[in-house]
Amino acid sequence: MTISLENTTVGQNPAGGPPTGKAPLDMEGLAWILFGASAFQYLNAACELNLFELLENKPGLTKPQIGAELGLADRANDILLLGATATGMLTVEDGRYQLATVLAELLKTDDWQRFKDTVGFEQYVCYEGQIDFTESLRSNSNVGLRRVRGSGRDLYHRLHENPQMEQAFYKYMRSWSELANQHLVEVLDLSGTSKLLDCGGGDAVNSIALAQANPHIEAGILEIPPTAPLTEKKIAEAGLSDRITVKPGDMHTDEFPTGYDTVMFAHQLVIWTPEENTALLRKAYNALPEGGRVIIFNSMSNDEGDGPVVAALDSVYFAALPAEGGMIYSWATYEESLTKAGFNPETFQRIDFPGWTPHGVIIATK
């Protein structure tokens, strides 16, 4: 069964600019792809320099005024404003600059900082490792990990040796989850759940949101030992140490704790191969009682294999960097793994989330 919270149609961008993924590609769209890395650097620079906040607070500034406010030399200011206007992030009329409508609206919401955290993740976690994307495809492995200092077997076991990257990573993961877990809280019926196991729960962002929305549940977070102190800190800050506990361990090599009637994988199964996902889901199946449920919550690509575009672009990171496998898999790929793990396809439920991120949930019952 599929539940769609919002139907959207992807078509040609009437204002020009990046291709939307459905209309025929023209030369302007191809040029956007060719110079896409440069377009992102304009976005990142504008975020780090707080250009957008400046124009939110002082709309209509002139070029010299913006340069003075940002402390930029004339040439540097010319470059920044050329890029910001050419990409459509700003508009200029009679020499006065304004925010694009989409940015002006986003800045009014709590999602603005989450968006900026996503920009920081792309800059400080993804960018360097994605240089090795082609070689990662050739070798079918995450070659970009070689650019991250440390000896851990994957990115997650190296983050603690790279403080700036670690900070950017966990800020992003919290923000990326928050962009979607408001919908998770709305649609996920946990009335029949008493104890939830959050596998790879990171800094507890999803367990905290679900516990706050469902006062009757308790949660355990299975997380690797280097991350466990951060997890415990976030739980304590939320005042939920009496209801959420950390279970240090490795979900691949350790047995799952028992006594839970729901197992959740949030933003985890995009990291590993389908075979590894099947093994994890089988461990969840074995740990669950009859009637217990498994929840897969992360970004999804469509079953046709042609989008959404954010799912496609996000897959570059998963191919090149974190672990030796992973991408934004399709709904059907997860359902195949669930079936191989022992779950009955007749129990599967798809929930497609609204918004610009391609998030969704699959629920299966033992």
Curated annotation (Swiss-Prot):
EC number: 2.1.1.304
Keyword hit for Repressor: no
Known pathway: Antibiotic biosynthesis
Gene Ontology annotations of biological process type: antibiotic biosynthetic process; methylation
PROSITE patterns: SAM_OMT_II
Example GO molecular function: O-methyltransferase activity
Reactions performed catalytically: L-tyrosine + S-adenosyl-L-methionine = 3-methyl-L-tyrosine + S-adenosyl-L-homocysteine + H(+)
Keyword Disulfide bond annotated: no
Residue spans of biased composition, Polar residues class: 1-12
Protein residues bound to S-adenosyl-L-methionine: E223
Taxonomic superkingdom: Bacteria
Location of region: Disordered: 1-22
Keyword terms, alphabetized: Antibiotic biosynthesis, Methyltransferase, S-adenosyl-L-methionine, Transferase
A Pfam family this chain is assigned to: Methyltransf_2
Family: Belongs to the class I-like SAM-binding methyltransferase superfamily. Cation-independent O-methyltransferase family.
PANTHER family, per the entry: O-METHYLTRANSFERASE
Function: C-methyltransferase that mediates the methylation of tyrosine into 3-methyl-L-tyrosine (3-Me-Tyr) in biosynthesis of saframycin A, a potent antitumor antibiotic that belongs to the tetrahydroisoquinoline family. Involved in biosynthesis of 3-hydroxy-5-methyl-O-methyltyrosine (3-OH-5-Me-OMe-Tyr), a core structure of saframycin A.
Protein name in UniProt: L-tyrosine C(3)-methyltransferase
Species whose genome carries this gene: Streptomyces lavendulae
Lineage: Bacteria, Bacillati, Actinomycetota, Actinomycetes, Kitasatosporales
